[in-house]
Each structure stands twice: as C-alpha cells, then as structure tokens.
C-alpha cells in the first residue's frame, strides 16, 4: 500500500512540474503578419484530432519508443533479452502491416460530426517508418515489402489528408525530426545509446549533413505532393541547434532531453523552404524555444491557469498514443469538461486516437465523438471563435467571450447533478439591460441580479430539471463589461 501511495505522489508531482514548466515558458512570436493571422484563425477552431498510426499498432505497444535503449518505462520492455534481435523484429513489422479496413472517409465524417476542425497525422514517427510515399527510403507503407503497398489507398497520408479536407477540416503533418532507421542518424558503426544521434556530428559533419538533407527532402515531399498543409507539427525536440552546454534540459512533455551533441537540423532554413511552397503553414517545432514554435504543446495535461500565448494540449482519448488492446476510453463527461477548461484558459484541444492494425478505430471512440459532437452542436458558440475572459475558471464555472461583446459561462455538471436554482458568478459583470439565455433552449431567458463582486443567475425550476445538454450547460450573456 505504501508503494502505491508513493507512485501516486510521484505522478502528482510530475504533473505539477510539467504544468509549472509550461506556465513559465517564453513564447517568441513569428514576425510574419500572415502567420500571425493564421495562428489567430487556428485559435478560433479550438478542437482537433491527432492520430498516431504505424506498423507498431500490430503489437499494441507504445509507438517507436520500445526500440529506444533508455531506462524509461516507455522504452525497451523489461522482457527483452537481446536488444538487437528485438529491434530487428520490430523493424520487420512493416512486412506484415496490412490495414485492409482503412476507411479515411469514415474517420473524417466522424471527426467533422464531433465538431473537430483539424487533423494532425503521424506521417513519420521516430522509428522512421514513413506513412507516406517518400522516394528517399524503402522503409514505408508504399514499399514493396509492405503487403498494403498494392492497395489503392496505400499512401495513407494522402488518403487521410484528402478525406479530411473534403470535410472542411484543416490538415496537419506530424513529422519526427529524429529517424532511428536512418543510418545517418543511428549509424550502424556504433550502437545506439539513447534517443539521440549516436555519433558526434561535429566529428562526422558529412554524415550529419546527409541526414539534414534527407530530412529536408522528405519534408519538401510533403510540401509539394500532398496539397495544402495547414500545420507542420515537428516532434523530437532534442534534435536542435545546441545553444547551451551539453547536458540535460527540460522538455515540454516533462522529461529531460538528453542532448548529447549539437543536432542542428537547420530549422530556419527548413521553415523558409516550407513557406516557399506553403506560405500560410503554421510550424510547430515542439519544445524548441524560438520563432519556429508557432504555438506551444503541453503533452497529456492541462495547464493550471491561463497561458498568455497560443497553445494546444495534445491528450490521449484512451489507452496510449498508439493503438493498445483493451484500451479504456475517457468518459465523455471528462472530455467535454476538459475541452471547456482548455478553451477557458486560452488553448486548443488536440485529442488523440490510435487506429488499430486493421485500419479501424475503437468502437468506443466513435461513441465518445458522437457525444462530444452532440454537445458542441448545442454549445459550440461558447467554444469556437471565442477567447478567454476573466475570471477564466471559478469552481464549476468556465468563462469565454465572443468577438461580438458577448460572454459565455459554462457550468460543468457532475454525474447526476441538476442545475442549482441560483448560480453565483464572481469577477464578471453584465452590462445594464443585458440578457442571459441558456443555449439549446429557445426562449430560455433567465433572470439575473447584481450581487457582491458579480451577479447571480436565477435558474427556473423547469430548466433545472430539463437541461438542454448533458455534462455541461452554457449561459450566454449578450453584453458584458470588460
């Protein structure tokens, strides 16, 4: 029992540490007015889908990390006796990956119906397996060794991007800067020691330059062959120009980045190339402070307070980032509350689903998305095109403002809870004569009265007993004093 308490305490302290890191980070805006405008547009759409998918889904394991020789719980499994044999077995997963039930149009419809406005897909994760048709490697889903390569939708990145664009969603390319399959990153001359390049780029500059060129070439394939891409989401923050002494530095996800060498991937140059083909593209160079990190990405957590810069929480719906057998999904109530909490603090929610090895989603994922969509159809006015407004968060209340001078108060309902007859609101004042209505109920104007430092909403008994939406209710104020 004591050990369980210690583990629980460790997890709590880790979450607090990660939250503190995000709340204290420096944000450097992109100087381009066009990109600033696109970021503002992105802040309007609020809710997106992230998908981690690759051959690793066949084993139901954490994506890529099980071949990383680090002493971390998400890396090489304890059961592995021969690392190199295991790595070879892992790399052969592409030879049996055959997701014949892949239906991107079904995914796109489900995402749209859920109220999602953008998608980010893993075109390549750290293991280097390409889910797009790159001519710079044979380690790809369209390669002749992969049984799916003869399928008309073998280029799954293209199929996904086309399907989601057709439903009106933005599309984003997740791309891993490290590539553990590339002999120019993990050089077979040396054994890999951790997530980093396994040789000194300063000592072997030609090899490192080969890797930089390889990376740039693959990214430019995505820029030129896959239509308009709204977001480039670069992962692997340890691959960056070294500006501090070699050692460890905190990464946005909360663990330490073991930066063994200067790994200058020439990101400024790469972003210039991207924008020459995709002038409106938002670039997120995750966990690398600078103008190429157009917004910040707290990982699998929600910051404790308003953050004064563009940000997005990427959060797992259930299981892991990638598909896992017998995954347990988060309850719909929790996810709707989480979305409201994130938006009230100025962020976007990027909700992750890991497709299975046959190309399908969990049935429960569709159920959760249906419920989120039903809630947003009624209450989306409080979410989309909104911005945070003080007091942001107060107990069960979350606050947002519209661009028309209105404001929304989101009341988070606990399980089996009915709305109280009166709701005290502090720190926000309606204008004189302002009307308050409950979204989802026509003619549901409610009375309010000034009280203390705020006001009190009087909820009619009929509305309390029959709220128009489950999980959370929204009160819209026509005008507020700002």
Task: Put a short name on every predicted segment.
Residues 21-482:
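Mature catalytic domains of secreted/periplasmic carbohydrate-active enzymes
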């Amino acid at each position: 029992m004591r050990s369980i308490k210690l583990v629980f305490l460790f997890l709590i302290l880790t979450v607090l540490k990660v939250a503190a890191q995000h709340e204290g980070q420096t944000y450097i805006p992109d100087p381009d007015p066009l990109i600033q405008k696109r970021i503002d547009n992105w802040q309007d759409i609020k809710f997106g889908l992230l998908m981690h998918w690759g051959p690793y889904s066949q084993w139901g394991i954490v994506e890529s990390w099980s071949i990383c020789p680090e002493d971390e719980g998400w890396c090489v499994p304890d059961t592995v006796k021969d690392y190199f044999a295991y790595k070879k077995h892992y790399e052969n997963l592409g030879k049996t990956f055959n997701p014949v039930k892949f239906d991107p149009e079904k995914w796109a419809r489900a995402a749209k119906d859920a109220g999602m406005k953008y998608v980010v897909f893993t075109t390549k994760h750290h293991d280097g397996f390409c889910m797009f048709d790159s001519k710079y490697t044979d380690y790809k889903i369209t390669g002749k060794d992969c049984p799916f390569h003869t399928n008309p939708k073998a280029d799954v990145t293209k199929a996904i991007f086309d399907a989601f664009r057709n439903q009106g969603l933005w599309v984003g390319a997740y791309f891993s800067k490290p590539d553990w399959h590339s002999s120019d990153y993990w050089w077979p001359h040396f054994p890999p020691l951790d997530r980093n390049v396994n040789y000194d780029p300063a000592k072997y500059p030609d090899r490192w330059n080969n890797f930089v060129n390889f990376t740039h070439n693959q990214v430019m394939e995505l820029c030129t062959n896959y239509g308009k891409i709204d977001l480039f989401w670069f992962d692997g923050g340890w691959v960056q120009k070294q500006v501090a002494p070699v050692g460890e530095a905190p990464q946005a996800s909360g663990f330490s980045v073991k930066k063994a060498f200067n790994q200058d991937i020439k990101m400024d140059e790469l972003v210039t190339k991207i924008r020459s083909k995709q002038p409106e593209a938002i670039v997120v160079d995750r966990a690398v402070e600078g103008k190429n990190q157009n917004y910040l990405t707290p990982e699998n957590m929600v910051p404790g307070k308003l953050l004064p810069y563009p940000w997005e929480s990427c959060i797992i719906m259930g299981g892991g980032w990638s598909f896992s057998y017998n995954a347990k999904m988060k309850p719909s109530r929790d996810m709707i509350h989480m979305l409201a909490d994130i938006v009230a603090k100025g962020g976007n929610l990027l909700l992750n689903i890991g497709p299975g090895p046959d190309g399908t989603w969990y049935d429960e994922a569709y159920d959760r998305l249906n419920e989120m969509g039903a809630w947003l159809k009624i209450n989306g006015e409080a979410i989309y095109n909104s911005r945070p407004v003080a007091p942001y968060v107060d107990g069960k209340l979350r606050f947002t403002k519209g661009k028309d001078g209105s404001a929304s108060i989101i009341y988070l309902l606990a399980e089996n809870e009915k709305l109280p007859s009166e709701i005290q609101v502090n720190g926000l004042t309606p204008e004189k004569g302002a009307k308050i209505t409950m979204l989802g109920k026509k003619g549901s104007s409610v009375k309010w009265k000034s009280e203390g430092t705020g006001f009190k909403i009087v909820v009619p008994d009929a509305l309390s007993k029959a709220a128009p939406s489950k999980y959370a209710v929204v009160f819209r104020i026509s005008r507020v004093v700002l």
